[in-house]
Curated annotation (Swiss-Prot):
Recorded GO MF terms: epidermal growth factor receptor binding; growth factor activity
The keyword Transmembrane helix is annotated on this UniProt entry: no
Top-rank taxon, per record: Eukaryota
Cellular localization per UniProt: Secreted, Extracellular space
Name of the protein in question: Transforming growth factor alpha
One GO-annotated biological process of the protein: positive regulation of mitotic nuclear division
Subunit structure: Interacts with the PDZ domains of MAGI3, SDCBP and SNTA1. The interaction with SDCBP, is required for the targeting to the cell surface. In the endoplasmic reticulum, in its immature form (i.e. with a prosegment and lacking full N-glycosylation), interacts with CNIH. In the Golgi apparatus, may form a complex with CNIH and GORASP2.
The species this protein was found in: Oryctolagus cuniculus (Rabbit)
Paired cysteines (S-S): C8-C21, C16-C32, C34-C43
Predominant subcellular localization, coarse grouping: secreted
S-adenosyl-L-methionine listed as a keyword: no
Stored SUPFAM superfamilies: EGF/Laminin
Taxonomic lineage: Eukaryota, Metazoa, Chordata, Craniata, Vertebrata
Length: 50
């Protein structure tokens, strides 16, 4: 089974402000899985509707 995500390298441990960093294998770039109540590419915004 091939995963689309890997753990982010150490160089990206602080990439996500309020979330977990995952590395997109096919796009070769980091992405964030935001904690509840946060949105944005790097989970940098509070979700005022949450």
């Amino acid at each position: 089974v091939v995963s689309h995500f890997n753990q982010c390298p150490d160089s990206h441990t602080q990439f996500c402000f309020h979330g977990t960093c995952r590395f997109l294998v096919q796009e070769d770039k980091p992405a964030c899985v935001c904690h509840s109540g946060y949105v944005g590419a790097r989970c940098e915004h509070a979700d005022l509707l949450a």
